[in-house]
């Protein structure tokens, strides 16, 4: 990931996973003080799970499910880089390597206590891409390419086969 600004570290407890790159959690400030905040994962973006575009929604829901799975182990570490343009805390989330469920790539950030970055895990697994706050062009282009490929597949098949496939998809 890109160079990051000065940061602060906190322990967090999950309240709710909103999507693949945003959560609500309690941040432990110490001295028995906790605050509920919305955390936007810094440096990544995932497909939207609340959209009318069914292809994007499917990928967004997969990213959300993986994010939730990684956080279900309990307490995690939040490295906070301040507040973003929409008032959310910008951060990198670290969990136990045991939560990942597979071998961890060398390019995944690790904290000083051996925890691994969810932000990087989501990128490596294809649920997210690096994002600096600009226009979301990478996902838009990828979805457009996938839709074009689907249309091409439909054109190459006889009409009866397309109708049968559509009926099977809708009626199972």
Features from the language model and the residues they span:
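Small beta-barrel nucleic-acid-binding modules, primarily SNase/OB-fold domains
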Residues: 1-172
């Amino acid at each position: 990931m890109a160079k990051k600004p000065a940061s602060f570290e906190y322990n967090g407890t999950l309240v709710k996973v909103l999507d693949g790159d945003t959560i609500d959690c309690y941040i432990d400030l110490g001295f028995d003080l906790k605050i509920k905040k919305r955390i936007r994962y810094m440096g990544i973006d995932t497909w939207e799970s609340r959209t009318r575009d069914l292809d994007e929604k499917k990928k967004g829901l997969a990213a959300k499910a993986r994010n939730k799975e990684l956080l279900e182990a309990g307490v995690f570490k939040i490295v906070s880089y301040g507040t973003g343009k929409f008032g959310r805390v910008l951060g990198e989330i670290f969990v136990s390597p045991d939560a990942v469920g597979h071998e961890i790539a060398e390019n995944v950030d690790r904290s000083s206590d051996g925890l691994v970055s969810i932000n990087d895990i989501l990128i490596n697994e294809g649920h997210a891409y690096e994002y600096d706050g600009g226009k979301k062009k990478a996902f838009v282009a990828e979805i457009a390419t996938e839709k074009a490929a689907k249309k091409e597949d439909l054109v190459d098949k006889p009409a009866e086969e397309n109708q049968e496939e559509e009926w099977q998809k809708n009626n199972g």
